[in-house]
Amino acid sequence: MFYKVSKEDEYLFLGKRKRLVEQLKEKGITNTDVLKAIETIPRHLFFDQSTARPAMLEHAYSDKALPIGAGQTISHPFTVAFQTEKLEIKSGDKVLEIGTGCGYQTAMLVEMGAKVFSIERQKSLYDKTKLFLPYLGYRTIRFFYGDGYKGLPQHAPFDKIVVTAGAPYIPNDLLMQLKVGGIIVIPIGEGEQQEMNVLKKNSEQSFEKQVIGKFKFVPMLQNKV
């Protein structure tokens, strides 16, 4: 665990996180490492503290998406847990995250033992999160400001890739940067809802794909950096 629990957190928010874990179990999340990370990470700290209202903090451990600024949101805890579970993270995995946002998913990946490379196109979020996560103790993450569609070819290949915004299609650059045997989890769709796509790379030309459930994400925009 990277986060040092305060007395206030121990008596208030830690209990809320435990209840959230039970809710996620009821919704089908079974990976014990994912559930442990959810119980550990102080989600209530990932909102903009300059604008966060008491009512918003009250819902920090509800299964809701909430605004974090720059027109972006922190995803539902179930969505974060679902994507993380589908990645099948192993300790030491090199993971590319598209869309750092407030860093909650990023922290999940680190708690799972991953070596994280994270890209964010919103400069204000990039500037904030690259300081905030190390402050919480997550000091091994490599942060990048840029276009997620292009990935990070200079640091490829990756064991796993997770995309935290809804894309109209699966960018070929990301598929090229995935190791053989690796997994990419990405929501696809241009409407209000997207379908979660889970692809395993069997060879340089062959992928095994699953489409699982509908989710709601902010759009993944190209050439907007």
Language-model segments: which ranges?
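Class I SAM-dependent transferase core
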Residues: 2-96, 104, 112, 125-127, ...
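Conserved nucleotide-cofactor-binding alpha/beta core module
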Residues: 86-208
